[in-house]
From Swiss-Prot:
Role this protein plays: DNA-dependent RNA polymerase catalyzes the transcription of DNA into RNA using the four ribonucleoside triphosphates as substrates.
Keyword Metal-binding: yes
SMART domains in the cross-refs: RPOLA_N
Protein name: DNA-directed RNA polymerase subunit beta'
Organism of origin: Polaromonas sp. (strain JS666 / ATCC BAA-500)
Keywords: DNA-directed RNA polymerase, Magnesium, Metal-binding, Nucleotidyltransferase, Transcription, Transferase, Zinc
Length: 1408
């Protein structure tokens, strides 16, 4: 059998492997791979096209050119297999060995491997503890290195120039050895004793921070060498392997020219220089000539390995840099990304898509010709089985002739054989779905309208690809997992993906609207059949209000049977007819309203939860049919008279123009600054635009009609444009506003707003100037879109890469940890309800009823819709749930911590690749996000000019913990907290709203006061920021000197003067002084902060207007100074995609705020130039201090007590600080909330758990702090799971485990620092990753998906996970079996020797 296999050389499936190890090749290893030395640079003889002997394509070394035929033609055919021809020396075998046989070049002088030299950090430099510059000088023959100092005072490793060398030669003679080039470096490497070095370094791990870091790096490297058995001198090459010739082909073109791989050129150069050097050495040429040749050889080898890494790249004849071995594997077109991660697929086709409204959800229309081509092999086999064709060739002929029997067979073959459709770009898993093909005429693929939103497809010329799953297993997976009717929810948020859009929505909306005084209003019907007859007879309008007796089916929870109940409903004709398609178990109330797009989505969602998948799919198909039919019947059209321009528009605009004139007037007379004028003008126009659109929508949305009693009543309008927008079919209020209201303010390309608005609308038409202004925005939009797509794709790629190995690996990790979830309330509005946050998660502990403490949900229960209804009814406002971050599963996640699989609606299955799903969910809507950076201070801050806050609901007032306030002389409560919030609770004590209140606001409510909706809670001056005193006393100015720290400003108009704090360094003041106020009590002493001996000091910031005089009496809550908000610099707020990327890359924001490092009391130390020294003293007297630039806004004052992690200097928080001071949970909350803010602004819903999954991966590395008994080095970064495993092992042995701290890495860093070198190399920085891995002798355990794709195995996710587990179990059983057999044999042998007669052994002693 073996010989038979050999005969056809069919590769048997490779034996299984569980890991891949990478290392460095020793010269012996390279020689053992080689089949001979390449001595000549010749390639092929260009007349005979035969390879030259000993050349780069030599047949003797690499194998024959024709199958089973030697070069000279002496031996041909299979019978001479394995013979080596004595004439030409070629082995008679298959030609494909030319793809696998390697050669080698013996280098006349050693050459350093450029990767270990130049890939930063330089490994050679680390090992030898020399600088890269020095090593380069030695390698490229500019300096000598001492390799053996002998008895001289010279130091080993020291560098000397030519002149030094000559001088020392004269001085010491041959006492010492110094060498140049790679030989010198090689000698040094050979002279290293790893054990000695390691011991030395281990003892040296003390001293300065930098030294420790460097030593730790060296130590790690040395230990890696020792562990992997790699000798450092292998970093210098003596032998160069030569790639098999068929992998660097040379192809003759017609006309006597050749197309060749660049590698051949590079190899030729190496061989040429090498043989020249060999000749020079044999001739004993002068040192300087040989040296030059050696340098050139080193450069040639460098170029071959990595061209352009050092110096100028070698170029071919056409001035193009040659593609070296390194270029072959890196980058988008390198081996990893081009061939291993992205392969071309056979059995696939592509075509344009069109609409297939008659298809069922799980079907697609496949053009006959395409199907014939794709299913050819199946047809061939059927033809043979039926005996119509005897050979494949005959079958082929039969198919090509296109006889009727072929089409019959095609129908048969295609039946129940799903195909997969894919639309590029495939941004999430719904971008590939399986369908059952239906054969159609024509050449376009027909697609079901409802799956368009999942594919993001439209029919304006989109193309889609078809793939055929061939094996039975593949067909089974396609059918069960990928069939379109099994994927009706978005994995990103669990909402239905098969929601109708556009005309279907319009049809359903029109049908379910009600009209006053429609034909047949007030009729009563006994069932829907009667309604249909009346409608068909023309006696009934769809929109007429009628009464119908309808039967509803409710499901009995115990038995699962449907029980009918009948009652009379007041409804409309259209709704009654629509009720015929409702599935059993879905109440009529769900469609007894005007169905807008959102409502239809809800309807399908409810149907899925209540009636299950199958019913829902059927229902969706019926909805689609009804929608199309009714939209056609409704005959909604659009005409210019539908665009009603409001009469009030003219007045609003002229009023705005008048206001703008007034402001211009004020500006001219110097009352307002240029910036204020611009802001106010933009503000006026913004408000007016909104007003016009409000008036317009009010006019569009209502119409007056006569009811059947002859009275005039208002009803919702049947205006076509309004209906399209209102139903969600097409268009929006903003677009209607441009058509029929006014276009409003336009932005310049840089994002700033042009202050003259476009007052016209499209109905009236724009004039030239207005048209010109509006082209600005349109062009910016187009340019943005192109950029956005690329950036969004790159973000998705980085996200996928960081989470690609995260798979659900077990049911339950048994953790008791979790996160406390409550509704997110901002500015009084519930942005995300508790329901949305906990739906589909697992409770950590029992959820109790707030009043009677009964258990509502048990610990470990999945919180589904029904349970959450109960929780909401009971008034639970916070629940502790399990999250991906707190999951304790090693190398994966557990199903309980992840919770519901949003795409399928049940608990997540083991083997689901939740990481990839999370990355796709976040990346897919990326193209919808903006690329914009908002300029705050322009009109974008319009929203910020709020001056009061009012309650939205009735309830009881409460304040949050940081809220502090004082009562001033007028009895008003003045807020002195920086992060105070007013909370409103309902009668159950549930939080209803939460409002932030700025520092210096006046509260108009007290704690525990009951208020009604609409009550004002607090108000403040939005244009200035006050500086307030908390204590009473007499004002004592310090350092308030006119002309030094303050300047007198006289107002031109009013003639009043105020003091303005100026930056003292501008006025040539020698020492930096800070103007401030102290308070003096009645006895003349300084007022102290209660409980401390700090005096009350209140500092003034630059730009503050001082409001009090020296010696004035002030009470608590009084304003000492005001800072005009206009004086604040406009700061850019990063929005959209760049913000999301910034968060996931964990970048430190520019102008970041400072958080308190510890809990304690604030004080200010001695100032330095331009900086304030801020100190915090904790209760034990430990002091932490920070220098804060003067222009920063400091949020605390002398003597204030702050908590660890509280914000003390204004600015965006740094995620690293949050992790360090507040811990992982707080960090996760911060990233989740910030990312959600960006998506929410665009109206995109993403479930929190996807972001948590990414954050888990960003936190997957830890830093070793205390080594304990582990083999780690302090400061080393380790995979968290590996660390925990190692610690468990140490504890089991009773040793001291290592301690570690959390490390937050950005997604790019995290991807590159993964333990899998294959995955990291295929992501970015291929050279660096591979160099490091080779030196460390790394093993890749092939845990992630990417590694497995690259090595060509099934991925360990989904069905592949079960396969790998079964395989491993079988291997274990086989091992055990082998062991058992061996043991049995040994036992038998032993028994045999024991029972053998004693004399048989000759002189063996008798057994006693």
């Amino acid at each position: 059998m073996k010989s038979l296999l050999d005969l056809f050389k069919q590769f048997t499936p490779d034996e299984h492997f569980d890991a891949i190890k990478i290392g460095m090749a020793s010269p012996e290893k390279i020689r053992s791979w080689s089949f001979g030395e390449v001595k000549k640079p010749e390639t092929i003889n260009y007349r005979t096209f035969k390879p030259e002997r000993d050349g780069l394509f030599c047949a003797k070394i690499f194998g024959p050119i024709k199958d089973y035929e030697c070069l000279c033609g002496k031996y041909k055919r299979l019978k001479h297999r394995g013979v080596i021809c004595e004439k030409c020396g070629v082995e008679v075998t298959q030609t494909k060995v030319r793809r696998e046989r390697m050669g080698h070049i013996d280098l006349a002088a050693p050459c350093a491997h450029i990767w270990f030299l130049k890939s930063l950090p330089s490994r050679l430099g680390l090992v030898l503890d020399m600088t890269l510059r020095d090593i380069e000088r030695v390698l490229y023959f500019e300096a000598y290195v001492v390799t053996d100092p002998g008895m001289t005072p010279l130091k080993k490793f020291s560098i000397m120039s030519e002149d030094d060398y000559d001088a020392k030669r004269k001085e010491y003679g041959d006492e010492y050895v110094a060498k140049m080039g790679a030989e010198g470096i090689k000698d040094l490497l050979e002279g290293l004793d790893l054990d000695v070095e390691i011991d030395k370094l281990r003892n040296d791990l003390t001293g300065s921070e930098i030294k420790i870091k460097k030593n730790a790096k060296r130590l790690k490297l040395m230990e890696a060498f020792k562990k992997s058995g790699i000798k450092p001198e292998w970093m210098v090459l003596d032998v160069l392997p030569v790639l098999p010739p068929d992998l660097r082909p040379l192809v003759p073109l017609d006309g006597g020219r050749f197309a060749t791989s660049d590698l051949n050129d590079l190899y030729r150069r190496v061989i040429n220089r090498n043989s020249r050097l060999r000749r020079l050495l044999e001739l004993k040429a002068p040192e300087i000539i040989a040296r030059n040749e050696k340098r050139m050889l080193q450069e040639a080898v460098d170029s071959l390995l990595d061209n352009g890494r050092r110096g100028k790249a070698m170029t071919g004849a056409n001035k193009r840099a040659l593609k070296s071995l390194a270029d072959m594997i890196k980058g988008k077109s390198g081996r990893f990304r081009q061939n291993l991660l992205g392969k071309r697929v056979d059995y696939s086709g592509r075509s344009v898509i069109t609409m297939g409204p008659t298809l069922k959800l799980h079907q697609c229309g496949l053009p006959k010709l395409m199907a014939l081509e794709l299913f050819k092999p199946f047809i061939f086999s059927r033809l043979e089985a039926m005996g119509i064709a005897t050979t494949i060739k005959a079958a082929k002929k039969e198919v090509e002739s296109g006889t009727p029997v072929v089409w019959d067979i095609l129908e048969e073959v295609i039946k129940e054989h799903p195909v997969m459709l894919n639309r590029a770009p495939t941004l999430h898993r719904l971008g590939i779905q399986a369908f059952e093909p239906i054969l159609i005429e024509g050449k376009a693929i027909q697609l079901h309208p409802l799956v368009c939103s999942a594919f993001n497809a439209d029919f304006d010329g989109d193309q889609m690809a078809v793939h055929v799953p061939l094996s039975v297993e593949a067909q089974m997976e396609a059918r069960t997992l990928m069939l379109a009717s099994n994927n009706i929810l978005f994995p990103a948020n669990g909402e239905p993906s098969i929601v109708p859009s556009q005309d279907v929505v319009l049809g359903l909306y029109y049908t379910t609207r009600d009209r006053t005084n429609g034909k047949g209003e007030g009729l009563v019907f006994s069932d829907t059949g009667e309604v249909r007859r009346a409608f068909d007879a023309g006696e009934l309008d769809l929109n007429a209000r009628i009464s119908v007796r309808l039967t509803e089916w409710t499901k009995n929870k115990e038995t699962g049977e449907f029980i009918p109940s009948t009652k009379l409903w007041e409804t409309t004709g259209g709704r009654a007819l629509l009720s015929e398609i409702l599935p059993k178990g879905l109440p009529f109330s769900n469609i007894n309203k005007a169905l807008k797009k959102k409502e239809i989505s809800k309807l399908i969602n409810v149907s899925f939860r209540k009636c299950g998948l199958k019913e829902t799919v059927v229902f969706a198909d019926k909805l689609l049919q009804s929608g199309f039919r009714l939209a056609t019947k409704a005959g909604i059209s659009i005409c210019i008279d539908d665009m009603l321009v409001p009469k009030e528009k003219h007045d609003i605009i002229s009023r705005a123009q008048k206001e703008v004139k007034e402001i211009e007037q004020q500006y001219v007379s110097g009352l307002v600054t240029s910036g204020e004028r611009y802001n106010k003008v933009v503000d006026i126009w913004g408000k007016s635009g909104d007003e016009v659109s409000k008036v317009m929508m009010a006019q569009l949305s209502k119409e007056k009609v006569i009811d059947r009693h002859g009275k005039e009543v208002e009803q919702e309008s049947f205006n076509s444009i309004y209906m399209m927008a209102d139903s969600g079919a097409r268009g929006s209020a903003a677009q209607i506003r441009q058509v029929a209201g006014m276009r409003g303010l336009m932005a310049k390309p840089d994002g700033s707003i042009i202050e003259t608005p476009i007052t016209a609308n499209f109905r009236e038409g724009l004039n030239v100037l207005e048209y010109f202004i509006s082209t600005h925005g349109a062009r910016k939009g187009l340019a943005d879109t192109a950029l956005k797509t690329a950036n969004s794709g790159y973000l998705t790629r980085r996200l996928c890469d960081v989470v690609q190995d995260l798979v659900v690996t077990e049911d339950d990790c048994g953790t008791q940890e979790g996160s406390l979830m409550r509704a997110i309330v901002e500015g009084g509005e519930v942005i995300e309800s508790l329901r949305e946050r906990i739906l589909g998660r697992t409770a950590v502990e029992d959820v109790l009823h707030p009043e009677n403490r009964s258990v509502l949900a048990k610990a470990g229960a999945m919180l589904d819709e029904d349970l959450i209804d109960e929780l909401e009814a009971a008034g639970v406002d916070e629940v502790k749930v399990r999250t991906a971050l707190t999951c304790e599963t090693r190398f994966g996640l557990c199903a309980k911590c992840y919770g519901r699989d949003l795409g399928r609606g049940g608990l997540i299955n083991i083997g689901e690749a939740v990481g990839i799903i999370a990355a796709q969910s976040i990346g897919e809507p990326g193209t919808q996000l903006t690329m914009r950076t908002f300029h705050i201070g322009g009109a974008a801050s319009r929203a910020a000019i709020a001056s009061s806050v009012e309650a939205k609901s009735n309830g009881v007032i409460g304040f949050n913990a940081p809220m502090r306030y004082v009562t001033n002389g007028k009895g008003e409560l003045v807020v002195i907290a920086r992060s105070g919030e007013i909370v409103i609770h309902d009668e159950h004590g549930r939080e209803r709203e939460r409002h932030k209140v700025p520092y210096g606001a006046t509260l108009t409510v007290k704690a525990d006061q009951t208020i009604k909706a609409g009550a004002i809670l607090a108000n403040w001056d939005p244009l200035t920021r006050p500086i307030i005193t908390e204590f009473a006393g007499k004002v004592l100015f310090e350092n308030v000197e006119e002309g030094v720290t303050v300047a007198k400003q006289v107002d031109d108009v009013t003639g009043l003067s105020t003091l303005v704090v100026i930056d003292p360094k501008r006025r040539g003041a020698t020492k930096v002084i800070r103007p401030q106020v102290k308070l003096i009590d009645a006895t003349g002493n300084e007022v102290k902060i209660p409980g401390t001996d700090h005096s009350v000091t209140i500092g003034f910031q630059v730009g503050a207007l001082v409001q009090v005089r020296d010696g004035q009496d002030v009470g608590p809550g009084e304003v000492l100074a005001r800072i005009p908000v206009e004086g604040q610099k406009t700061r850019d707020i990063t929005g959209g995609l760049p913000r999301v990327a910034e968060l996931f890359e964990a970048r430190t924001p520019k102008d970041k705020g400072t958080l308190a490092e510890m809990t304690g009391t604030v004080s200010f130390g001695k100032e330095t130039k331009g900086k304030v020294r801020l100190q915090i003293t904790d209760p034990d007297g430990k002091v932490w201090e920070d220098l804060v630039p003067k222009e920063k806004n400091i949020l605390v004052h002398e003597g204030q007590v702050v908590n660890k992690g509280e914000s003390i200097v204004d600015g965006p928080a740094d995620p690293q600080d949050i992790l360090r001071l507040l811990g992982m949970e707080e960090l996760a909350r911060y990233i989740v909330d910030e990312v959600q803010d960006v998506y929410r602004l665009q109206g995109v819903k993403i479930n929190d758990k996807h972001i948590e999954v990414i954050v888990r991966q960003m936190l997957r590395r830890v830093v070793v702090e205390n080594v304990g008994d582990s083999s780690y080095i302090a400061g080393e970064q380790v995979e968290r799971s590996a660390m925990l495993d190692a610690n468990d092992a140490l504890r089991a042995e009773g040793k001291i485990p290592a301690t570690f701290s959390n490390l937050l890495l950005g997604i790019t860093k995290a991807s590159l620092s993964t333990d899998s070198f294959i995955s990291a190399a295929s992501f970015q920085e291929t050279t660096r990753v591979l160099t490091e891995a080779a030196i460390m002798g790394k093993r890749d355990e092939l845990r992630g998906l990417k590694e497995n794709v690259i090595v060509g195995r099934l991925i360990p996710a989904g069905t592949g996970m079960a396969y790998h587990e079964a395989r491993k179990a079988k291997d274990l059983m086989d091992d055990a079996e082998r062991r058992a057999i061996a043991e049995a044999e040994a036992a038998e042998l032993e028994a045999a020797t024991a029972t053998a007669p004693a004399d048989a052994g000759g002189d063996s002693p008798a057994t006693e």
